């Protein structure tokens, strides 16, 4: 991790839910994504900010 890379604040998980399923999310540090197992979606984290848009989410395999 570089010095200029912004890190996701895990405390945000307490306030965030999946916009599709309205369920809690899991943080995938390696892929920098928030995972909704219920909706089968992964929301990207860009510059430490979660992008909670369904259109931006990746469908999980």
Curated annotation (Swiss-Prot):
Record InterPro entries: Trm112-like (IPR005651)
Disulfide cross-links: none
Gene Ontology annotations for the cellular component aspect, listed alphabetically: cytosol
Highest taxon of source: Bacteria
PANTHER family: PROTEIN PREY, MITOCHONDRIAL, ZGC:162634
Family: Belongs to the UPF0434 family.
Protein name: UPF0434 protein RD1_0037
Organism of origin: Roseobacter denitrificans (strain ATCC 33942 / OCh 114)
